[in-house]
Amino acid sequence: MTILKANSLEKSFGRRKVVDGVTLEIDAGEIVGLLGPNGAGKTTTFRMICGMLTPDQGQVLLRDQDVTDWPMYIRARDGGMGYLPQQSSVFAKLTAEQNLIAMMELLNMPSDQQLTRCNELLEQFKISHVRKTRAGRLSGGERRRLELARCLVSRPEIIMLDEPFAGIDPVTVQSIQTIIRQLAREGISILITDHAAREILQITHRTYVVSDGRILCSGTADDIVRHPGVKEKYLGDIDLESTKWPKPVFTRLAPTGRNFTPTGVRADDL
């Protein structure tokens, strides 16, 4: 079941067309990558899908509802979309716990539900031991996990991850990959973009590669690394022999009460 679809997106800056007819879709519980060389239009495409930019042409649909003109905060509030920015977004002077509570208050979550939800997220992201630590004193990995936890406060149906592997060590990268897989098992759809192509291809069900403002290739990691155009313009001879690719299966979630509630989700069976 398709959760998000971008139809024929176009965007120009001055006389330069940066995105020229990009179409992509994401199913429920699916991890989808968005890759491409610098200047290819990948970031602009991602920002249009998030609601940070408005396309000149084309549509963005969330569960078949046109949200093209919705700003990011409305997509988060009413459309079930979460967003993890590339730059650190935590409140450095607040504790990890206070960061989560602040987001809950911003979303008008009932006060009697806040502590329970906070405890769930701290445990899920393995940061309970730093709940009383100021965010500015957390390690890079702890801070990234806190940012992911904040992204899930509202129980989104799809999350957009912008450079989640930037500035963290290999062990933490593996930890974040594990979390992303778990989120997919829980039925959350994920669109992820990063310069770390290998790490992206290790966890995605499908990936789109953008070049010169258009989709150059889409498919599994194996499809991507074998595509001659992708090799020439982007990946070169990247070695992914040891990579395991998640295999989607279908499961079912309880209703969330939102207009965009799924009747079925896809999750991986790792």
Describe every region a protein language model picked out.
Residues 155:
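Conserved catalytic motifs of ABC-family nucleotide-binding domains
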Residues 66-82, 87, 111-115, 225-228:
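ABC ATPase NBD coupling module
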Residues 134-138:
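Conserved ABC ATPase signature
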Residues 50:
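Helix-to-loop junction immediately C-terminal to a conserved catalytic motif
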Residues 35-37:
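The feature captures the beta-strand-to-loop junction immediately N-terminal to the Walker
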Residues 101, 112-130, 178-181:
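Conserved ABC ATPase "signature" region
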